[in-house]
Amino acid sequence: MLAKDDLGEVDPSLPDQVAAYRGGYLPEERRALERSLRSGDLRAVATTNALELGIDISGLDAVLVAGWPGTRASLWQQWGRAGRTHGEALGVFIAREDPLDRYVLEHPEVLFGQPVESVVIDPANPHLLGPHLAAAAAEQPLTEDDATQWFGLTAVDLLPDLVERGFLRRRPTGWYWTRRDRATDLIDLRGGAGSPVQLVEADTGRLLGTVDAARAHSAAHDGAIYVHQGSTFRVRALDLDASVALLEPVITDYSTTATDIADYTILHTDEELPWGRGSLSRGEVEVTSRVVGYLKRRYATGEILGEEPLDLPERKLRTRAVWWTVSDEQLCDAMVTEPWDIAGAAHAAEHASIGLLPLMASCDRWDIGGVSTPLHPDTGRCTVMVYDGHAGGAGFADRAFVIAEQWLTATRDAI
């Protein structure tokens, strides 16, 4: 929106030659933008990582990546969008005020001197495995031998649950898909949990796009500002039961950023190691979070114009986590003794560690979350936790535990 205004001051024809692109747009909108980009009618596009994979776009001369995209693989894939026709192209990485971005600038060897990240996944996670078993049964009857051979020993234990929930039916020849809808629709490649929330213009009924259910509380709450192809809308109402947000067009000079609070309970500690005078652990946790308000920020300057409260329900996530504790002696040695100083230092360590983990594990910054507290009741110490943002865990926290020395050393260097 601001880019189009600036371009219009240079040449009135330029605003129509740039556009925005993201995965939440309607399919017909995305296809039209892709055609315009291929034909040259569009000279530039501001996009999320939705253009990173699966779309053959040629003729691009340059790619500017604003902010670390999450992994080395993503950065090279995005840069690789340019130069497919003429053989030469320009790839630029523009760092943000972020610990990971600064770390990459100061340690370019992590980009140019190493292979892409190791793929991390927990294939036994029932939240991931269940939909895949259903999709396999929809292709042909799934036998116990097939389930064990292709999906692992834990797969057979999930089949009765899928039967009980009405997805599969047991027959002498195996398990069958029973529903009329497609089994593959159970698999959300965008990582959301639950049905996507539809963004609808209230006065016309026009569908503007969708947002993942997991992001709806922070991106489609009442009062949220939503920008669609240069037009600005404000969320009039969010109906979580119907998975619909009603929007109205507005003219405004501010954006919105949700604020939330979070806490966690350690359900089970699988492994604990001494970590200096503290400890390093991994296990199962339950994270409770709630969006409590949002900030209004002026577009041009980032100035905070105000804060509005929200009344949204709590969300609970049972997942895998890695956490470490800091002893009182360590805090005293570092001359961090006041409660607010301890909380601030722990929060800084939490954000830095979240930012650095994608360099070591094939995850996006938004695949993981973090919580820190000066004194947690389950540990009795200052505790910093990083958890998988997917129900049941995706393997990122367990990977972090294994490479903790490399990961937390990089975090310390970034701080």
Place the predicted regions along the sequence by residue:
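Helicase motor core with emphasis on the C-terminal RecA-like subdomain
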Residues: 1-142, 148-184, 193-194, 204
